[in-house]
Amino acid sequence: MDFGVVVSSSWNVKEVTECARVADEAELDFLLMTDHYMTPRSNESIDAWTVLAALATQTERIRLGTCVTPIPFRPPQMLAKIIATVDQLSNGRAVLGVGAGWHQAEFDAYSKWEEDKIRVAKTHEGINLITRLWTSKEPFDFKGRFYCAKGAILEPKPVQKPHPSLWFGTTGPYMLRLAQRYADGWVPPVPGVSAEVYETVLAKLRKPGGRRIKLSFNGTLNELIETIPKFADLGFDGAILARESPQETPQAIKELATEIIPSYR
């Protein structure tokens, strides 16, 4: 089982950097950062991918990604370039968390809010364009319903081959169908989900003979202590420390590393 931690883009740079340092030293497998410019709880935020680029130069082994990036929020060509750069800086440790977005206020302020089915369709098309930029060796033209590119080429390529992992963070039926096709992993929303949602995800993304998709669950330190055996038996293979305060998270990481992880590696 892999172990990770999620930090919030509403925390300050010092808090996030300290969590990343401790997580890297504790040999956690990944650190994920929420990717919001505004939330219902706070209008304070730092840009996730800018911070992850900085963390890439300050860590050695831990994978770095988002939980999750709303694909329709930014131009996909620019997002592809940003993540490829983080993958270069980290020597192949970038992870793209994939979502369609949910908080209308931040889209209204920074992007463009559209109905659910349009955001899902833009996510689908955006992922196609992003992965093509990551893998195409020659310039290409792209003309989709929402995005267009002429003579597009991305260099240098990401270090990871064929490209950085895509970890979907969604519970809706349409996005789960996309996850069936594209996902390398699935992560739950930070607030957590019900047992019924976990059962649905397991049924949709772990079909016999289907692609192997890493499935994760999350919780506070105490919640993980209680639930890891159950989720491991169900076939989940990623545990994410979440919902701890920025002040408590470094110590929780240390306790996770010393008291829990050795039993599952």
Segments (PLM) and residue ranges:
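Active-site-adjacent structural elements that line small-molecule/cofactor binding pockets in enzymes
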Residues: 1-265
